[in-house]
Curated annotation (Swiss-Prot):
Pathway: Purine metabolism; IMP biosynthesis via de novo pathway; 5-amino-1-(5-phospho-D-ribosyl)imidazole-4-carboxamide from 5-amino-1-(5-phospho-D-ribosyl)imidazole-4-carboxylate: step 1/2. GO terms for biological process: 'de novo' IMP biosynthetic process. The keyword Nucleotide-binding applies. It catalyses: 5-amino-1-(5-phospho-D-ribosyl)imidazole-4-carboxylate + L-aspartate + ATP = (2S)-2-[5-amino-1-(5-phospho-beta-D-ribosyl)imidazole-4-carboxamido]succinate + ADP + phosphate + 2 H(+). Pfam families: SAICAR_synt. Its EC number is 6.3.2.6. Keywords: ATP-binding, Ligase, Nucleotide-binding, Purine biosynthesis. CDD domains: SAICAR_synt_Sc. One of its GO terms (molecular function) is ATP binding. Belongs to the SAICAR synthetase family. Coiled coil: none annotated. This is Phosphoribosylaminoimidazole-succinocarboxamide synthase. NCBIfam families: PRK13961.1, purC.
Length: 296
């Protein structure tokens, strides 16, 4: 099995920050994003590494970014370590397969969530109010139902350890202006529809997903990750049955385990049994194999 990477430490490179999963290095006119094997749930980072998770996320993101280039440009300069600047080469073994050299964009202060099915926080909102992010939905929907049309439900971008807050489209307009808000809404739904159709041919339902965008040289581009098991709900099509939660190829498996514990969903995280770690890794790898036809 490949070496597990919980955290990178590259003394010759300038660390710009660590997110829940990614370590980001500032290379001057570009960023180096290294996707570790960390996993978070309920905005808390677990103590254990998930085997090959960083590899899976990077490969799935690359796959989707390529599929969407005619809809919107993305931030990737290269995912081939040989193309990275000279100062990165001594770390090639750790970077291989889990890193991206990317453009330095100015991130927009909203996360762009699109939902094709009703699940997760959307289902909770609907049960309480009959709506999600101010969008009224038909009465009588059940958990995991397919929506007639995908809906755009943005959220704020919280600081590490805080929770994102769902916001209305009008609030999104307040934050970034109407023209940009309409553009990211339309692009988000267009990407989702194409991905949904591609995934459908591979036996996967993409129930919902989230994107981040930035401005680079005055142009809107998609940044961060693209439809990975961290940012999306992937369900097996062959066992889809509305009326309850669905089995999944994402971290829902981990969330479901954590829900059985007497844990307050705040740091420190509880220890994870070896079987949960292994099975979570297998679910991530299965998503990669199903989508791209290639494992590791």
């Amino acid at each position: 099995m490949a070496e597990l990477v919980l955290k990178t430490d590259f003394p010759d490179l300038k660390l710009a920050g660590r997110g829940k999963v990614r370590d980001i290095y500032d290379l001057g006119d570009a960023l180096l994003i290294v996707t570790t094997d960390r996993i978070s749930a309920f905005d808390v980072i677990m103590n254990e590494a998930i085997p090959d998770k960083g590899y899976v996320l990077t490969q799935i993101s690359s796959f989707w970014f390529r599929q969407m280039e005619d809809i919107i440009p993305n931030h990737i300069i290269s995912t081939d370590v040989k193309d990275f600047p000279a100062e990165c080469q001594k770390y090639a073994a750790q970077l291989e397969g889990r890193s991206m050299l990317v453009k330095k964009a100015k991130p927009l202060p909203v996360e762009c969530i699109v939902r094709g099915y009703i699940s997760g926080s959307g289902w909770k909102d609907y049960k309480a109010t009959g709506a999600i992010c101010g969008i009224t939905l038909p009465a009588g929907l059940v958990e995991s139902d397919k929506l007639e049309e995908p809906i755009f439900t943005p959220s704020t971008k919280a600081e590490l350890g805080e929770h994102d807050e769902n916001i209305s489209f009008d609030k999104c307009v307040e934050l970034i202006g109407r023209e940009l808000a309409e553009k990211i809404r339309d692009v988000t739904i267009a990407i989702y529809k194409r991905a949904r159709d591609i995934a459908d041919t591979k036996g996967i339902i993409i129930a919902d997903t989230k994107f981040e965008y930035g401005i680079y040289n005055g142009e809107l581009i998609i940044i961060d990750e693209c439809m990975t098991p961290d940012s999306s709900r992937f369900w097996p099509k062959d066992s889809y049955k509305p009326g309850g939660a669905q089995p999944s190829f994402d971290k829902q498996f981990l969330r479901d385990y954590l829900e059985t514990l007497d844990w307050g969903k705040t740091a420190p995280a509880p220890p994870l049994p070896e079987e949960i770690v292994r099975k979570t890794g297998e679910k991530y790898m299965e998503a990669l194999v199903r989508l791209t036809g290639k494992g590791k």
